[in-house]
Design a protein with these regions (language model features):
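Hydrophobic anchor at the beta1->P-loop junction of P-loop NTPases
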Residues: 6
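P-loop (Walker A) phosphate-binding loop of NTP-binding proteins
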Residues: 9
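ATP-binding Walker
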Residues: 12
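Walker A/P-loop
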Residues: 15
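NTP-dependent small-molecule kinase module
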Residues: 24, 128-171
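Conserved nucleotide-sensing/catalytic segment adjacent to the nucleotide-binding pocket
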Residues: 30-82
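A glycine- and Lys/Arg-enriched "phosphate-lid" helix/loop adjacent to the NTP-binding pocket
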Residues: 88-136
């Protein structure tokens, strides 16, 4: 476990899991939202993102949390030796986004880009969740299963599995 890609729908616990893995393994954590978005909440220029992303991919070790542009996502999956796909039920993800929004009125969420609006980000998360079934689907799951033949892959489908994964890897 030297190059770890953590991905899934918005509000699935990626940041919490990634932070725990980074703390336990000592691997550097790169939260994609912090690379992709400026403090204003606007995306950085694509060339700037691509260069930063590529520099991380060629480094010796990393944990990258998030999705980002699809081309970059595919490169990340290819470069990773470990895939962690968090595929929680949609109602759970919607609840986590709502909870993050409500708590975000008082405390900045973990992994949230510095200076970015929690409200704008939450609205974007709701939009992404609405579109998610067109991407996070059986076809994508088949791709992950195919990659699992030459990589370590974990698919987490419930809160109890998420908790067990964190507890197991937090030792």
């Amino acid at each position: 476990m030297r190059k770890v890609a953590v991905f899934g729908k918005p509000g699935s616990g990626k940041s919490t899991l990634s932070k725990t893995l980074a703390k336990v393994t000592g691997l550097p954590l790169h939260q994609l939202d912090s690379l992709f978005y400026q403090k204003s909440g606007e995306p950085v220029a694509r060339e700037i993102f691509d260069k930063a992303h590529e520099d991380i991919l060629i480094s010796e070790s990393w944990i990258i949390d998030g999705l980002g542009p699809l081309g970059a996502f595919k490169k990340r999956l290819d470069a990773a030796d470990t895939l962690v796909y968090i595929d929680l039920p949609y109602p759970t993800s919607y609840w986590f986004v709502t909870k993050r929004l409500l708590k975000g009125m008082f405390i900045k969420p973990e992994g949230w880009p510095e200076g970015s609006s929690v409200l704008k980000g939450s609205i974007q998360s709701y939009k992404m969740l609405r579109l998610s079934p067109s991407f996070w689907n059986d076809e994508f799951m088949a791709e992950v299963e195919g990659m699992a033949q030459h990589k370590t892959a974990f698919v987490i489908r419930s809160l109890s599995e998420l908790k067990a994964f964190i507890e197991k890897h937090a030792r």
